[in-house]
Amino acid sequence: MRVNNGLTPQELEAYGISDVHDIVYNPSYDLLYQEELDPSLTGYERGVLTNLGAVAVDTGIFTGRSPKDKYIVRDDTTRDTFWWADKGKGKNDNKPLSPETWQHLKGLVTRQLSGKRLFVVDAFCGANPDTRLSVRFITEVAWQAHFVKNMFIRPSDEELAGFKPDFIVMNGAKCTNPQWKEQGLNSENFVAFNLTERMQLIGGTWYGGEMKKGMFSMMNYLLPLKGIASMHCSANVGEKGDVAVFFGLSGTGKTTLSTDPKRRLIGDDEHGWDDDGVFNFEGGCYAKTIKLSKEAEPEIYNAIRRDALLENVTVREDGTIDFDDGSKTENTRVSYPIYHIDNIVKPVSKAGHATKVIFLTADAFGVLPPVSRLTADQTQYHFLSGFTAKLAGTERGITEPTPTFSACFGAAFLSLHPTQYAEVLVKRMQAAGAQAYLVNTGWNGTGKRISIKDTRAIIDAILNGSLDNAETFTLPMFNLAIPTELPGVDTKLLDPRNTYASPEQWQEKAETLAKLFIDNFDKYTDTPAGAALVAAGPKL
């Protein structure tokens, strides 16, 4: 029996895991590399070496999160605070689970992990020591330990010596629940949380993102209750210390646009905003790689090297990668430690208060302008609406762009009612004097997607202040303030009506989209604050 760093089998027995053969505790990258490429491994455990030096893995049938299989134990801790799927008008994935069914699922996972050689990774979620979660991840799969090491904050040796986990994640990807039907669950797979036990269980799905987004959901529960904003956004900081945050759903450009050679990256996906400023929850990045090219996204491309972990990409026999091949999934990914990006905030991923708040949307209708400047009420309206087109493959079964509304640009990860996040964000923005913008990274009347080059020029204009000084005109129906011209952007693109053969074509699509906005926002009109925001939305 080899036990690393003093972690004993007895400690794992406290979670219900018995007869552990071997504990590989906080393995080094070199050890993980050897483990993943072990020729005796079969199936989804096996890694493949690519010519870029990174290992590639296959996550099985689950190439994205499985929101329909997400459950929260409803008990005295959560009954009155959680945003439940079966209450109120808002649609979310927080399905209640009985304590009895939880115990059954826990038994399945602990039996799966018992008698095995286990990887245990202790890591932090949150760069602020006052509010971070100390999380212990337990898995029998080497690459899942690698994913966690990439994505969470890696403790120093000193921090590990005194590490006391306040959340446990047990990943039993190889086990499923045969009794799901009689228990009234969605399928044999499950991703379940217990806030009283402070534990997450995973069964049936190998997708690494369940661990990442699971802890994000927990931060989304704990922080806003303390008045700290918890945000599905990327963030970066300029030379003068000016901080920008980029909200957006998967595939709208959060990672791409915040990874900017002119600015230092704070993080690419999950952040908090407290009295000191903006801080990252993570220690790594999880970038989409479909159609990745060195020319368009050099920072991300260059981050794919030894210690990065590729998911679901096509690897040719000679080890080269076909980034254009989406036959397995459009949601091909790479995780890498944040220091694989040269231009990052060091030594801790945090900075001051944000002054620019950017909402990214990928409008499949081609109605919204590439950029508009929002009023305070429009900021709340568009934050609560969280409109985008769901882009291919970040969830199972979605391959074409379809319009979606996701509260706070991350409804799948919200644990409290959306208005609570809006209230906290607005307070933080007002205190910092921050301005919000709506940026469409999607399509226009030409049927083509707005280019990364044009979007980057728009972001530059926001960040250097030239957009705030530009003359604006108002787009009818949506009442959005659009600049008449911006440096480096074709003026014709700024007004979406110009990209159609006739203004009537835009009008017709705009009416369809406006109606969708109005219908979606109806769920917030049962409170006086929500009803007051209706005027900030589109009008037919």
Curated annotation (Swiss-Prot):
NCBIfam families: pckA, PRK09344.1-1, PRK09344.1-2, PRK09344.1-3. It is found in: Cytoplasm. HAMAP family: PEPCK_ATP. This is Phosphoenolpyruvate carboxykinase (ATP). The keyword ATP-binding applies. It comes from the Bacteria. Its cofactor is Mn(2+). It catalyses: oxaloacetate + ATP = phosphoenolpyruvate + ADP + CO2. The gene is pckA. InterPro entries: PEP_carboxykinase_ATP (IPR001272), PEP_carboxykinase_C (IPR013035), PEP_carboxykinase_N (IPR008210), PEPCK_ATP_CS (IPR015994). Involved in the gluconeogenesis. Catalyzes the conversion of oxaloacetate (OAA) to phosphoenolpyruvate (PEP) through direct phosphoryl transfer between the nucleoside triphosphate and OAA. PANTHER family: PHOSPHOENOLPYRUVATE CARBOXYKINASE (ATP) (PTHR30031:SF0), PHOSPHOENOLPYRUVATE CARBOXYKINASE ATP (PTHR30031). GO terms for cellular component: cytosol. Substrate binds at R65, Y207, K213, R333. The keyword Manganese applies. GO terms for biological process: gluconeogenesis. One of its GO terms (molecular function) is ATP binding. It is an enzyme of class 4 (lyase). Belongs to the phosphoenolpyruvate carboxykinase (ATP) family.
